[in-house]
């Protein structure tokens, strides 16, 4: 091991571009992990969301378009369009202490909504990674209609 440490400065000197790229990627990975840890909401898998639903009865918010919601959604979810999603709404104020899980079709726009909920003071915010597509891929039940 000490042989490697003694030759490390020589390697870095001979491969400066490679070493700088490695350091940049390492810093980016560490920064990404720190931001993930401190963002205030947790990403859930479909199995973890199922456990949350069974144990704590969270408020499920589906951010899909109304037509997509009618085609398929997680049973018990409420449909709210992202353009109409307002965490400061007086109807949501009573559930600030209750768990809230958000999802959309693919899981991209719901992450933005989760961040808005945390900013508004919600304590337990969850986001379904992969969205409804991941839920369906896990062969979990979906409801149709309103």
Predicted regions and their residues:
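Metallo-beta-lactamase
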Residues: 103-104
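Structural scaffold elements adjacent to functional motifs in cytosolic proteins
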Residues: 60-62
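Rhodanese-like catalytic fold shared by cysteine-dependent sulfurtransferases
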Residues: 2-43, 47, 52, 66-99, ...
């Amino acid at each position: 091991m000490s042989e490697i440490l003694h030759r490390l400065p020589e390697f870095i000197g001979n491969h400066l571009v490679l070493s700088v790229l490695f350091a940049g990627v390492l810093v980016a990975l560490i920064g990404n992990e720190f931001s993930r840890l401190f963002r205030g909401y947790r990403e859930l898998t479909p199995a973890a969301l199922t456990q949350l639903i069974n144990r704590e009865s969270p408020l499920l918010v589906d951010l899909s378009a109304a037509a997509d919601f009618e085609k398929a959604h997680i049973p018990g979810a409420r449909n709210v369009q992202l353009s109409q999603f307002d965490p400061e709404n007086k109807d949501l104020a009573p559930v600030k202490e209750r768990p809230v899980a958000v999802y959309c079709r693919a899981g991209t726009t719901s992450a933005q909504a989760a961040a808005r909920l945390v900013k508004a003071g919600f304590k337990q915010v969850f986001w379904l990674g992969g969205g409804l597509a991941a839920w369906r891929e896990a062969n979990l039940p979906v409801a149709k209609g309103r």
